[in-house]
């Protein structure tokens, strides 16, 4: 039984045009080799997060925090995957197919809870908003947020190769490159705690962290920091995988070993997280979950769909009081 991976979603082969056409401008088949980041070492160090450079730089590069949400094994893993991440038919194909659903969910929820979004034009629903994508990877979601008109978009990731690839990919698109030049789109190599310790400000209308929390150390602390950087009345969006028997069958055995949809080792069941645990973490930060929505993937059609079943993948929306 591969539960969500085969069953219900087989009945959903036709997608609404709104979803199929959402983020239509997302690039197809711009595939980079690992050599594309070789000339970009100037991006390695910044005030938020420092690492050892390949150049002869022997300065004291240390982080400023004593505790961290970073798991170095996860960073190493995703650094290795970065060169194939923008290939829509590669190892991240399920994530490419998921992205329009994630964006639709974010826009739909913001339209309900943010007055600016409810009045914005349909093609620029995020106009006037400051948004951050924490754990942005190579920028799949970040680029979409920038295209949809957000005044300020920050893509934050602790994996150096991901940030280099995100900057490189955006530079091939005229609009995104303009956004980088005028600082309305900014990619930073940093952990969430280092970013907060420097900025120390509730500055974002929306904080997004999708398919990330199951890869961090100390998820409670991670939610603490997400809650600190969102404005009162602002939104936090999380997507992750529930910690159930069915999620082990689907997301690990099915996705990694049977269907080979993602590389083996992408997920670890002990790092999956139940909605009730996230609810507790948000409650302790004066935030309230307003919505939970499941996502189901059909490996036969390579398509996602929304569902009310939260046993495997799910999205949530929380509001800071």
From Swiss-Prot:
Q: Name one GO cellular component term.
A: mitochondrial inner membrane
GO MF terms, alphabetically ordered:
3-demethylubiquinol 3-O-methyltransferase activity; 3-demethylubiquinone 3-O-methyltransferase activity; polyprenyldihydroxybenzoate methyltransferase activity
Give GO BP annotations, semicolon-separated. Answer: methylation; ubiquinone biosynthetic process
**Cofactor entry:** Mg(2+)
User: Which residues does the record give as Mg(2+) binding sites?
Assistant: 211, 214-215
Q: How does it sit in the membrane?
A: Peripheral membrane protein
Pfam families attached to this UniProt entry = Methyltransf_23
Q: What does this protein do?
A: O-methyltransferase required for two non-consecutive steps during ubiquinone biosynthesis. Catalyzes the 2 O-methylation of 3,4-dihydroxy-5-(all-trans-polyprenyl)benzoic acid into 4-hydroxy-3-methoxy-5-(all-trans-polyprenyl)benzoic acid. Also catalyzes the last step of ubiquinone biosynthesis by mediating methylation of 3-demethylubiquinone into ubiquinone. Also able to mediate the methylation of 3-demethylubiquinol into ubiquinol.
Protein name in UniProt = Ubiquinone biosynthesis O-methyltransferase, mitochondrial
């Amino acid at each position: 039984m591969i539960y969500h991976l085969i069953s219900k979603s087989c009945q959903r082969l036709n997608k609404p045009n709104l979803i199929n056409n959402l983020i239509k401008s997302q690039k197809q088949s711009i595939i980079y080799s690992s050599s594309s980041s070789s000339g970009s070492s100037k991006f390695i160090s910044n005030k938020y997060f420092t690492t050892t450079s390949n150049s002869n730089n022997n300065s004291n590069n240390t982080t400023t925090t004593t505790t961290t949400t970073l798991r170095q094994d996860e960073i190493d893993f995703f650094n290795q995957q970065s060169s194939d991440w923008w290939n829509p038919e590669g190892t991240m194909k399920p994530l490419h197919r998921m992205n329009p659903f994630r964006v639709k969910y974010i826009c739909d929820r913001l339209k309900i809870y943010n007055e600016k979004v409810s009045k914005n034009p349909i093609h620029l629903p995020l106009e006037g908003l400051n948004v951050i994508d924490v754990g942005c990877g190579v920028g799949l979601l970040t680029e979409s947020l920038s295209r949809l008109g957000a005044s300020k978009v920050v893509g934050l990731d602790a994996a150096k190769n991901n940030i280099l690839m995100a900057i490189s990919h955006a530079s091939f698109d005229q609009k995104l490159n303009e956004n980088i030049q005028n600082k309305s789109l900014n990619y930073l190599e940093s952990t969430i705690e280092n970013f907060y310790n420097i900025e120390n400000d509730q500055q974002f209308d929306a904080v997004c962290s999708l398919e990330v929390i199951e890869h961090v150390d100390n998820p409670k602390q991670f939610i603490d920091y997400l809650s600190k950087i969102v404005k009162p009345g602002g939104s936090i969006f999380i997507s992750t995988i529930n910690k159930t028997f069915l999620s082990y069958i689907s997301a690990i055995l099915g996705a990694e070993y049977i269907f080979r949809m993602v590389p083996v080792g992408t997920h670890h069941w002990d790092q999956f997280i139940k909605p009730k645990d996230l609810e507790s973490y948000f409650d302790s930060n004066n935030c309230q979950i307003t919505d939970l929505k499941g996502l189901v993937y059909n490996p036969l059609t390579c398509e996602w769909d929304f569902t009310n079943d939260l046993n495997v993948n799910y999205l949530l929306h929380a509001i800071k009081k």
